From Swiss-Prot:
Annotated protein name in UniProt: Protein NRT1/ PTR FAMILY 5.3
Subcellular location: Membrane
GO BP annotation list: response to nematode
Organism: Arabidopsis thaliana
UniProt keyword Membrane, yes or no: yes
UniProt superkingdom: Eukaryota
The gene coding this protein: NPF5.3
Cellular component GO terms, alphabetical: membrane
Higher taxonomy: Eukaryota, Viridiplantae, Streptophyta, Embryophyta, Tracheophyta
Tissue note: Expressed in roots and siliques.
Length: 586
């Protein structure tokens, strides 16, 4: 290889190896590195969902908690698991970098899994068995037992805070934005990334859930812990192939400096003279393997932060690039806001959908019954199939019509998922009304121990459609917040996805408790320990209306959203969302 060829072979996006040396495209990154990341994700998701999928059943049957309490404990924990990535993203971007942050967090994650396995294995760490079907008459878990169990759960949540925002970003970093082939592969990466997630989830919601229900919780959780250990081992094997981006300082501090500087100069008159705005020389960016961003007209108030007024203090004067990076993170906030309600939908399939399944006939044969949480496997399978069809058929077809490399825009993809969410909750409400009717006809309204003579597969449509919806909205969320974040804030951008999930789960807890308390005062509560006496059909229809209102707000938000400028100049910059509202009105 000639000197010129060696020079051309180096990546141009600033990626380095662990020692800080430039890396070659031919020797690092791309799919040969991503294969380790993808395999890691399969086993890690198997481990995580091996715990979370059946958690509401464990809390009900083993810790003897009621419907609302167990559901809220699950959603609060899952919400925390999605909230801690904000801290993980900060540590990665400001201090240790993604790789080191990920490795340290993985050790904490594994510790939490091991402690959780012990808590479900040792008899002294859980309350005695209860023979009655009414959990209100069972002995509750002691303070120490709850402390060990939830301590392990939240240790696990802290660990995931450093893995979730960084692992997908590490994977995306393996593709050089300045190489046309790499850029095309990155578009497919997020689809196959989600494919790996749901492949692991499918195994967890079928095999591991069955083991927990029929063999033992200790063995089921033990297998999850071994799966996590194996996933970390696989990730470390690929270390020499990974490309790394250097930490570029705290994004929170940078954003705070821009906002403070602009407020301090609020009374300063704006200037049309570009020389009055501060920016670093291009060579200084080149030395850091970074790129300047040109000034834009959006959120013009923040431009004052880069206006030269005499003081050069960093809290009074920022670069144009820092201002534009802050603008971009702020411009994504309205989009983030309208993803909260869709995230609440995921909380329903992890809690109330599963509790519904416990009331139905779960027998496949005389000797085999399907665990209620295993219906999540159909959601996963539906999403796996949908992703493949979307990536291999839908994108190619739509690309010819729209000229967009992705087929349709990311926000259009989100919108389709939101429409499906409305349909899902309408179907769920109708199905639940039918379930209550069958229970009443067989005199089972006040019974909890006897299953309703109605197959658990009656719930299948809502599970399958949820997988289809996730193939649109969840992948679009992940890719949108990564793609639209500035280069120096990619981990923070990815953590927007985690924030969406966290807020959605916490909102679900608040909503469930509020609706339960309010409807109790009106007479028959919508959510009770005995679901046959509840009115989940009303609750689900309320969700359908909530999703409809959120979708209308979504259309307003995207009408005014402008995509960020692409520093590689390989795509149109500052392009408005093309006629999505018009498309929906046609």
């Amino acid at each position: 290889m000639t000197v010129e060829e060696v020079g051309d072979d180096y990546t141009k996006d600033g990626t380095v190896d662990l020692r800080g040396n430039r890396v070659r495209r031919s020797q690092t990154g791309r799919w040969k590195a991503c294969s380790f990341v993808v395999v890691y994700e399969v086993f890690e998701r198997m481990a995580y969902y091996g715990i979370s999928s059946n958690l509401v059943i464990y809390m009900t049957t083993k810790l003897h908690q009621g419907t609302v309490k167990s559901s809220n404990n699950v959603t609060n924990w899952v919400g925390t698991s999605w909230l801690t990535p904000i801290l993980g993203a900060y540590v990665a971007d400001a201090h240790f970098g993604r790789y080191i942050t990920f490795v340290i967090s993985s050790a904490i994650y594994l510790l939490g899994m091991a402690l959780l396995t012990l808590s479900v294995s040792l008899p002294g760490l859980k309350p005695p068995k209860c023979s009655t079907a009414n959990v209100e008459n069972c002995e509750k878990a002691s303070v120490i037992q709850l402390a060990v169990f939830f301590g392990a759960l939240y240790t696990l949540a802290i660990g995931t805070g450093g893995t979730k925002p960084n692992i997908s970003t590490i994977g995306a970093d393996q593709f050089d934005e300045f190489d046309p082939k790499d850029k095309i592969h990155k578009h497919s990466f997020f689809n196959w990334w989600m494919f790996s997630i749901f492949f692991g989830t499918f195994f967890a919601t079928t095999v591991l859930v069955y083991v927990q229900d029929n063999v033992g919780w200790a063995i089921g959780y033990g297998l999850s812990t071994l799966g996590l250990a194996f996933s970390i081992f696989i990730f470390l094997l690929g270390t020499r192939l990974y490309r790394h981006k250097l930490p570029m300082g705290s994004p929170f501090t940078k954003m705070a400096r821009v906002i403070v500087a602009s407020l301090r100069k609020a009374r300063e008159p704006m200037s049309s003279d570009s020389t009055r705005f501060y920016e670093l020389p291009p060579m200084e960016y080149a030395s850091k393997r970074a790129f300047p961003i040109h000034s834009t007209s959006s959120l013009r108030f923040l431009n004052r932060a880069s206006l030269k007024t005499g003081s050069t203090h960093k809290w009074r004067l920022c670069t144009i690039t820092e201002v534009e990076e802050t603008k971009q993170m702020l411009k994504m906030l309205p989009v983030l806001f309208v993803t909260f309600v869709p995230s609440m939908m995921l909380a329903q399939i992890m809690t109330l959908f599963i509790k519904q399944g416990t009331t139905l006939d779960r027998r496949l044969t005389n000797n085999f019954s399907i665990p209620p949480a295993s219906l999540l496997g159909f959601t996963t399978f539906s999403m796996l199939v949908s992703i493949v069809i979307y990536d291999r058929v839908f994108v190619k077809f739509m690309r010819k019509l729209t000229g967009n490399p992705r087929g349709i825009t990311l926000l259009q993809r989100m919108g389709i998922g939101m429409i499906l969410h409305i349909l899902i909750m309408i179907i769920a409400s109708i199905t639940e009304r039918y379930r209550l009717k069958v229970a009443a006809e067989h005199g089972l309204t006040h019974q909890t121990a006897v299953p309703i003579p109605l197959s658990i597969f009656t719930l299948l449509p809502q599970y399958v459609l949820m997988g289809l919806a996730d193939a649109f909205i969840e992948i679009a969320k992940l890719e949108f917040f990564y793609d639209q974040a500035p280069e120096s804030m990619k981990s923070l951008g990815t953590s927007y996805t985690s924030t969406s999930m966290a807020v959605g789960y916490f909102m679900s807890s608040i909503l469930l408790s509020s609706v339960s308390q309010i409807t109790k005062k009106q007479g028959r509560g919508w959510i009770q320990n005995n679901l046959n006496e509840s009115r989940l059909d009303n609750y689900y229809m309320f969700f359908a209306v909530l999703n409809l209102l959120n979708f209308i707000l979504f259309l307003v938000v995207i009408r005014f959203y402008e995509y960020r400028a692409d520093v590689t100049q390989s795509a149109n910059v500052e392009q408005k969302e093309p006629n999505m509202v018009d498309n929906y009105n046609e």
